[in-house]
């Protein structure tokens, strides 16, 4: 904002050369002391928009035209596979013990042990539920299709046959190797290293570990950390539930007047707590095995897909993506989460 001077002094076109008094000014042209040429150089965003400016066409998100077996919700922010029956079973198996615990066991533990006990279980249980939904609804790293379509040329019939391409892995290391990139005839692209095509989702996924039917999604680069946290929180919650369930049923028996433990289990809170102890012990077996298996694969620099389909498992060659154990965990679990390839609507991303 500029001002106009009310004195007889010779005015200069530059504000810093004007000997003006702040008490002798009035509001004037906001572009003063600019001349006409300088006014025309004002950025367009500060000028008034004329009525005849054409509208920018709407750019649709890529997920709307992606021919895969995925269901998208909330403008592509939530997505999962179309085979959701096993996911409903796993969701019910996770919700049931939590509801029973807070109805029958949490009250006795709150008043007879400590309020911190049910609060700790609530934190672990909430972490398991949130990580489950985050893992199952996040984009695992689906690669956009038709990135390299092969066109048939009658003069060169072999033009539709993809050529092998190699990518140098670990270029700054002395043990760097070349890794072959496979051409996907379904998605029409050269898959990056460690990417694979999922036949259930019908998409190429970056860093595909495996397709989990119980979470109804592929476990890839963008949701692997949520899958790891889900396994860890489920194991801790199940083991914690086992101890709390047995402690509640046995502790309430010693404080009651019942002489028979079998008769004491007929009481609702005692019987349900004993059931939760057995339920937690059985429920910790499979997630515990998967968690230990994932820790082993991370430590050796592989994933499930690479481990099961390795062609040179009997050789002594070091895996090209293997580094130290701590660095492997750091790369897999703490690497930045890149932008989804199929959801963005910005023009810079499309």
Swiss-Prot record:
Keywords: Acyltransferase, Endoplasmic reticulum, Golgi apparatus, Lipoprotein, Membrane, Palmitate, Sporulation, Transferase, Transmembrane, Transmembrane helix
Post-translational modification: Autopalmitoylated.
Reactions this protein catalyses: L-cysteinyl-[protein] + hexadecanoyl-CoA = S-hexadecanoyl-L-cysteinyl-[protein] + CoA
Gene Ontology BP, a term: sporulation resulting in formation of a cellular spore
Transmembrane segments: 87-107, 113-133, 226-246, 271-291
All ranges on the Cytoplasmic side of the membrane: 1-86, 134-225, 292-350
Keyword Transferase: yes
Protein purpose: The erf2-erf4 complex is a palmitoyltransferase with a major role in driving sexual development. Palmitoylates ras1. Palmitoylates isp3. Palmitoylates rho3.
Domain of life: Eukaryota
Name of protein: Palmitoyltransferase erf2
Active site (catalytic residues): 212
Start and end residues of each DHHC domain: 182-232
Stated family: Belongs to the DHHC palmitoyltransferase family. ERF2/ZDHHC9 subfamily.
Name of the gene encoding the protein in the UniProt record: erf2
UniProt free text on domains: The DHHC domain is required for palmitoyltransferase activity.
Subcellular location: Endoplasmic reticulum membrane; Golgi apparatus, Golgi stack membrane
Listed GO MF terms: protein-cysteine S-palmitoyltransferase activity
Family annotation (Pfam families): DHHC
Lumenal topological domain: 108-112, 247-270
Gene Ontology CC: one annotated term: endoplasmic reticulum membrane
Membrane topology: Multi-pass membrane protein
């Amino acid at each position: 904002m500029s001002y106009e001077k009310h004195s007889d002094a010779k005015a200069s076109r530059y504000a810093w050369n004007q000997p003006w008094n702040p008490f002798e000014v009035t509001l004037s042209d906001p572009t003063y002391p600019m001349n006409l040429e300088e006014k025309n150089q004002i950025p367009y965003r500060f000028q008034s928009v004329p009525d005849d400016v054409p509208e920018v066409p709407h750019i649709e998100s890529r997920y709307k035209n992606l021919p895969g077996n995925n269901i998208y919700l909330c403008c592509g922010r939530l997505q999962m596979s179309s085979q959701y029956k096993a996911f409903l079973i796993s969701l019910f198996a996770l919700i049931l013990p939590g509801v029973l615990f807070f109805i029958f066991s949490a009250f006795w533990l709150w008043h007879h042990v400590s309020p911190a006990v049910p609060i700790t279980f609530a934190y672990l249980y909430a972490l398991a539920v949130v990580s489950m939904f985050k893992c199952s609804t996040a984009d695992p790293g689906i690669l956009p299709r038709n990135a390299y379509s092969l066109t048939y040329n009658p003069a060169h019939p072999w033009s539709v046959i993809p050529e092998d391409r190699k990518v140098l892995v670990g270029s700054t290391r002395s043990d760097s190797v070349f890794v072959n990139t496979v051409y996907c005839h379904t998605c029409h692209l050269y898959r990056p290293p460690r990417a694979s095509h999922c036949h259930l989702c019908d998409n190429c996924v970056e860093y595909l570990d495996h397709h989990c039917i119980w979470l109804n999604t592929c476990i890839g680069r963008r949701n692997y950390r949520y899958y790891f946290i889900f396994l860890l929180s489920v194991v801790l919650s199940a083991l914690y539930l086992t101890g709390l369930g047995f402690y509640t049923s046995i502790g309430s028996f010693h404080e009651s007047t019942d002489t028979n433990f079998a008769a004491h289990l007929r009481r609702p809170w005692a019987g349900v707590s004993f059931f939760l102890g057995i339920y937690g012990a059985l429920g910790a077996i499979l997630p515990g095995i998967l968690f230990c298996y994932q820790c082993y694969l991370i430590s050796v620099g592989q994933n499930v897909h690479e481990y099961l389909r390795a062609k040179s498992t009997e050789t002594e060659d070091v895996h090209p993506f293997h580094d130290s154990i701590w660095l492997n965990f750091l790369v897999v679990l703490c690497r930045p989460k890149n932008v989804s390839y199929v959801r963005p609507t910005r023009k810079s991303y499309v």
